[in-house]
């Protein structure tokens, strides 16, 4: 089940951080590392700092875009500070661990970490169902990348161990929630429909789509509910075409 949990690093700029992250992951039983458009490729320094976790580096998935790293996932959590222009559903690390383990029993989960200096962009954070913030010392809250991964990975392991110690049988069943790919298609469909009806203007959607993303992220519709919403959009499109005919 832990293999279903992806640690996703976005545009990492130091190979040493890749190695340190791999070490942090493996100590907690995580091995599924994804590197999104890394500014440098893993090298001997990454292997050295991995300190026995070189297999995690060697098996890392290297992709060009965040969408590729999130494909097939039903839950995405991004690391972020709380002060954002557009508030988002928040988790603390413990809640993140519990949710990740519960969902990873059936489908892949992505835990996304941003660039060393600037973290994740707002656009990247909007692709996440939740944001997770580590309650560090407010007078000195500077965690490096590997430290942040270690904190989250520890909580994932504690949540997983609890299921083992309690003798809980993790049920493998079809997840009720849509994959990230399906959600992105829905958002594209929604934007096209709103453009066609004149509700938003092309190239000037403003904050409307961002707020709608937040609304549906907060509601987190199940797959069948998302299909209903897609059906409603298709009906509106059909009606709109009929009115223009």
Swiss-Prot record:
Record's keyword annotation contains Manganese: no
| Biological process terms in GO annotation | tRNA nucleoside ribose methylation
Q: Where is the signal peptide?
A: none
Sorted alphabetically, the keyword list is: Cytoplasm, Methyltransferase, S-adenosyl-L-methionine, Transferase, tRNA processing
- Alphabetical list of Pfam families matching this protein: SpoU_methylase (PF00588)
* This enzyme's EC code(s): 2.1.1.200
Subcellular location(s) of the protein: Cytoplasm
**For this UniProt entry, what's an example GO CC term?**
cytosol
Binding residues for S-adenosyl-L-methionine, per the UniProt record? 79-81, 114, 134, 141-143
Concerning InterPro entries, the annotation shows:
Alpha/beta_knot_MTases (IPR029028), RNA_MeTrfase_TrmJ/LasT (IPR004384), SpoU_MeTrfase (IPR001537), tRNA_m1G_MTases_N (IPR029026)
Q: What job does the chain carry out? A: Catalyzes the formation of 2'O-methylated cytidine (Cm32) or 2'O-methylated uridine (Um32) at position 32 in tRNA.
Q: Protein name, please? A: tRNA (cytidine/uridine-2'-O-)-methyltransferase TrmJ
Q: Which gene encodes it?
A: trmJ
